[in-house]
Amino acid sequence: MREILLTTHHENPGLPVEVHCHGFDEVDFSEFAALDLVLLDRKCAEENVACIPTLYLRQNRLAEFEQFMQRYRALRVAGRIPHLVGIALEGPLLASHGGTPAATVWAPTRHEWERLARLGDLGLVYTVISPDAFTTASGLYDNLDDRHPRLDWIVPLLMAHGVRPALGHFTKADPQGAAELVRDIVDLAWQSEWTGSGARVITDHLFNDMPLNIKHAFRTSAARAKRESTLAAYDLPNWTLADMDQIAGPVPAAIMNEAAAGRIAACINFDGEHVDLAIAARAAGLMGHANTMLMTDRCDSARIGGQELHQTDDNGLWYQDGGIVAAGSQPLARQMRNAQQMGVADAPLWQLVAGTAHRAFGTGAPAELATAGEAR
């Protein structure tokens, strides 16, 4: 693989960023009380990447997580973990938990949201939330009451502490309604006071855990036998943002159009298993590589968030019981090679793996996302 402006300078804008990952080697990041941050930083240095560890959080461990964030902040201030450029949460406010451990999906109360938001001052850079978390189809709905504030209160609170909502884990009940909620949250984020730098809104991985009109992945040998004919029918070269609502569905269309407008930094996986590589490459081109981040969803061991995982002979994904995808296994370097094999040139590849992330999280180049100037 050709090196794409890679250096070993701490937080250099050219250092690739593992934006959303769950575990390196045998370490499950969600076991944060025992997480050796200095050792993890050393591992990142060996791989020549910056990293935003993404953790799952159980409700009864919020106080422990606050202590962890204090420890993270102290090490950052001391300059001991320069490669760990932020911490992220997946959840807890998820309408559909998908591969997320069910015990880590919960609806915080007003006071719990205030505690979570304050962690932005210590380095919490985003938390995955579902725009449709408060709809009747949400898995959280039956447990909601007047103690639980809605998104019109939550989003401005997060903005005030520099914590980005990362949109994902949609139900499939009302695609059009969910797309409207995406636009509502983006509008709200851009209208709110923002104390951070870079992107105000990001996403979980595009095409995963959301309602779709297309088959986005071919994970078994039987599915792969039909891949070429399926993709030919999709006519990827003629996809446009204007038609994406009909092609892929209202939710991916809303995300892709907001990203192309520079109002979202969108994440997409290039392992070829979460999303087919041809679809991923076309989507990134439509949104603009300067508005798109390659995320790995990586876990190196058969355990995540306290749950045991397994793999199959068909692909390298990690699965929960019941055949639900929980995480990927391919590191950033492998996914960079995948993107290159799809014809992504050096300059846009650098944006996918480094430039967009450093702008989005305010760790490198100018803060505002670029409006896509690429083919629509």
Question: What do the predicted segments below correspond to?
Answer:
Residues I214, R219-I268, R282-A375:
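His/Asp/Glu-enriched, well-ordered alpha-helical/loop segment
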Residues E18-F24, L37-E66, I81-S96, G120-G139, ...:
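Divalent metal-dependent hydrolysis catalytic cores, especially in the metallo-beta-lactamase
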Residues R2-L6, S30-R42, D152-P156:
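N-terminal glycine-/serine-/threonine-rich phosphate-binding loop
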Residues C21-L35, G99-P108:
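Active-site mouth loops of central-metabolism enzymes
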Residues R2, H9-L15, K43-V49, R71-L75:
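N-terminal hydrophobic targeting/anchoring segments and the immediately downstream early-domain regions
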Residues A74, W106-C267, H274-T292, R337:
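Histidine/acidic residue-rich metal-binding segments in metalloenzymes
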Residues D28-D36, L62-R73:
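Glycine-rich anion/phosphate-binding loops
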